[in-house]
């Protein structure tokens, strides 16, 4: 059985769905969000868990034979950065403790494309040295720390770490008003968000594709690396989305960096299934009967 923490969030739920499609049993943890999406209803085991509770976390191993862990649970920063770091670091350490205690095969953990911030190269590849630079958000700062904490914590344990440098993900279950990605606002609105231009864009991946990539990295017979970029592998522009929707955007804009996924494809065979048109059609159909 594979454990997905934060398994009812957008990325976690699509990861669980993809693992089910590969024939695996899945247990997901839920804390703040407890609504089970229709595509998981009755198909996964749901455990209510505050990942900062070490005893409760380790007790999962007494109820389930867990073979692998995908750690995606995380909190949203408030006014106190130390409180945010304490919460998410405690959850990470408890997940790592569980991985070592249970002797799981593989431990996959969420990092971010934001760790590359400051590199001028396009696209971003895993072999680039991560720069020392001011970071735009507390979440990215924590994700940058997650990487060495995970690999060093699991060194010599027999548990294989898999660091997931996750790109810009959108799709079913995304926050419709996400401050990190204007795509949902563009697709959901009759008029485009202000200050959005045809040439604006960068990295993007549709959530079902992202979940499938994580599932493949979690279950692949062998992996040649411990760090993988996770996205569609191609840049996008908001002009592409606007064209699909018949919306006009003003010209201009800046196309931001995107992730190279050659390593992911080489080790798992992953290729995205959704282009811009297919993702918009799938998302709009989903939103007909779902609030997010």
Q: What are these regions, as identified by a protein language model?
A:
Residues 94-138:
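Conserved Rossmann-fold NAD(P)-dependent oxidoreductase catalytic core, especially the SDR/UDP-sugar
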Residues 51-87:
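NAD(P)H-binding glycine-rich loop region in Rossmannoid oxidoreductase-like domains
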Residues 138, 142-145:
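Active-site helix of classical SDR
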Residues 63, 79-108:
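NAD(P)-cofactor binding segment of oxidoreductase domains
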Residues 148-202, 207-211:
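NAD(P)-dependent short-chain dehydrogenase/reductase
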Residues 41-53:
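Rossmann-fold cofactor-recognition segment
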Residues 2-22:
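N-terminal Rossmann NAD(P)H-binding glycine-rich loop of SDR-like oxidoreductase domains
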Residues 195-292:
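C-terminal substrate-binding subdomain of Rossmann-fold SDR/epimerase-dehydratase oxidoreductases
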